[in-house]
């Protein structure tokens, strides 16, 4: 796909909504509230925002600028800037190839629960064995996995403007509205105020270096960094779009949805689950075990639960679309394939790679890799190992190989870059140290040596 043939977002709004859709995913909803509650409430929020304005801003701006400067996806972009460092692009490209299949498996779980709440089966979801019974099956997990990844493929097949951009323009506003409505309902419920205080009031007794580390890790994984996604979306960005302000708006979306997720979940858990912080949990247990019980206990819970899982589905879909679009873009650039054959190949490969994750809690449940289920292993390799390595190499590449000026000049081609001094300091000195700490803590966390 040459630069002349390359698709583009129609303007700034389309780019921001698509990139924000990529950044807003399951991690915003099932991990951020848990970490905020665990690590000091308001203190965690403050640390997270400060890191977003510095560390997150710098990494995202660098990736988008690399994409726009070269007009290429991750594999070819690094090669175009310096042939010796093309391997960074290959590492970045491997991340969405690994993540898309298992993420789509989880997306299928979300669709299953959304259907349960919309079809009158919500009361059964509160049973302790409902979730384990579902994921340990064969036909149902595979069916919902196929449906989710099929919808993703159809959107990507439609192209950047008619598919990715148009879907983002519909889903993101609905996602924001649903988040606000559910958050308002949650915080105004009887008994919810204790949860609001627990979430928002600073608790200095829980503040430590681990608070910063947890906020750093959450921000890093939440913003779709080091996956080639922002490079790909940057390559679709028009040259006259203000890159710096676009990044700020993406961060506002991402942080805002994460904040609202906390207001949706924590007060509701306090109000309808006996007010116990221990009830929170994170990940699938929060989403698929705790929340159905919360909805069952609240007035109008079936409707609120359906709205909640629609919201979560939209968050999952906008992220999976960006993952598949990135892999398809790489196939187009690297192998000179058209969009349709690229989509077919990526879909087929993702289904094959995703099947072990879909069946890993059932018929293949006895198979473990370094003591992990298939889905957990793929998550560990991509999130805990490859993403920090790719981000570290990107910082070194920008900071010391092509130099920050190359990126600053690209950003300033559309508007003055107000934070260029901050960008240079963070990309060269601060971000590499942060990323090494994230890598170490992620590996230790995965093996239960140091829990975050």
Regions picked out by a protein language model, each given a short descriptive name:
Residues 1-30, 59-64, 68-80, 84-87, ...:
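Membrane-interface "cap" regions at the ends of multi-pass membrane proteins
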Residues 2, 107-136, 236-240, 245, ...:
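Helix-loop-helix connectors at the membrane interface of multi-pass transporters/channels
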Residues 2-5, 9, 13, 165, ...:
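Membrane-embedded translocation segments of transport machinery
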Residues 3-6, 34-39, 69-91, 104-163, ...:
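Inter-helical loop and helix-membrane interface segments of multi-pass membrane transporters/permeases
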Residues 7, 36-62, 88, 140, ...:
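Extracellular loop-to-transmembrane helix junctions
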Residues 8, 13-15, 22, 141-143, ...:
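Loop-to-transmembrane helix boundary motifs in multi-pass membrane proteins
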Residues 11-51, 245-248, 252-255, 286, ...:
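Transmembrane helix-boundary motif of multi-pass solute transporters/channels
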Residues 91, 137, 335-347, 379-435:
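C-terminal membrane-solvent junction of multi-pass transporters and transport-like membrane proteins
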């Amino acid at each position: 796909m040459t630069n002349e043939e390359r698709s583009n977002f129609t303007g700034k709004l389309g780019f921001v909504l698509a990139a924000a859709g990529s950044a807003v995913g399951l991690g915003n909803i099932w991990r951020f509230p848990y970490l905020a509650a665990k690590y000091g409430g308001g203190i965690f929020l403050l640390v997270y925002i400060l890191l977003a304005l510095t560390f997150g801003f710098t990494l995202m701006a660098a990736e988008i600028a690399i994409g726009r400067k070269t007009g290429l996806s991750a594999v070819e972009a690094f090669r175009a800037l310096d042939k010796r460092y093309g391997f960074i692009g290959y590492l970045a490209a491997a991340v969405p190839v690994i993540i898309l299949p298992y993420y789509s498996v989880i997306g299928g779980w979300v669709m299953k629960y959304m259907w349960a709440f919309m079809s009158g089966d919500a009361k059964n979801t509160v049973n302790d064995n409902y979730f384990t019974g579902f994921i340990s099956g064969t036909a149902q997990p595979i069916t919902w996995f196929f449906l989710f990844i099929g919808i993703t493929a159809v959107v990507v097949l439609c192209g950047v403007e008619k598919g990715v951009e148009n879907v983002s323009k519909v889903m993101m506003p609905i996602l924001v509205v649903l988040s606000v409505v559910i958050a308002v309902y949650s915080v105004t419920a009887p008994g919810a105020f204790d949860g609001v205080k627990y979430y928002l009031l600073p608790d200095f007794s829980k503040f430590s270096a681990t608070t910063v580390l947890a906020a750093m890790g959450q921000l890093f994984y939440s913003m779709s960094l080091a996956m080639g996604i922002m490079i790909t979306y940057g390559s679709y960005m028009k040259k006259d779009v203000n890159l710096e302000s676009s990044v700020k708006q993406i961060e506002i979306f991402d942080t805002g949805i994460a904040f609202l997720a906390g207001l949706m979940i924590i007060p509701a858990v306090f109000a309808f689950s006996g007010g116990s912080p221990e009830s929170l949990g994170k990940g699938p247990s929060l989403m698929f075990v705790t929340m159905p019980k919360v909805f069952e206990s609240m007035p109008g819970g079936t409707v609120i639960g359906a709205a909640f899982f629609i919201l979560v589905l939209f968050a999952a879909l906008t992220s999976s679309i960006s993952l598949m679009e990135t892999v398809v873009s790489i196939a187009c650039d690297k192998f000179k394939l058209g969009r349709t054959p690229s989509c077919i190949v990526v879909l087929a490969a993702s289904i094959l790679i995703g099947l072990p994750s879909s069946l890993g809690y059932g018929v293949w449940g006895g198979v473990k890799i370094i003591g992990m289920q298939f889905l957990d292993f793929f998550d560990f390799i991509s999130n805990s190992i490859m993403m920090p390595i790719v981000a570290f190499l990107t910082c070194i590449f920008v900071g010391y190989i092509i130099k920050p000026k190359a990126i600053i000049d690209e950003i300033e081609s559309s508007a003055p870059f107000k934070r260029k001094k901050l960008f240079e300091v963070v990309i060269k000195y601060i971000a590499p140290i942060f990323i090494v700490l994230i890598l170490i803590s992620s590996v230790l966390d995965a093996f239960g040596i140091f829990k975050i």
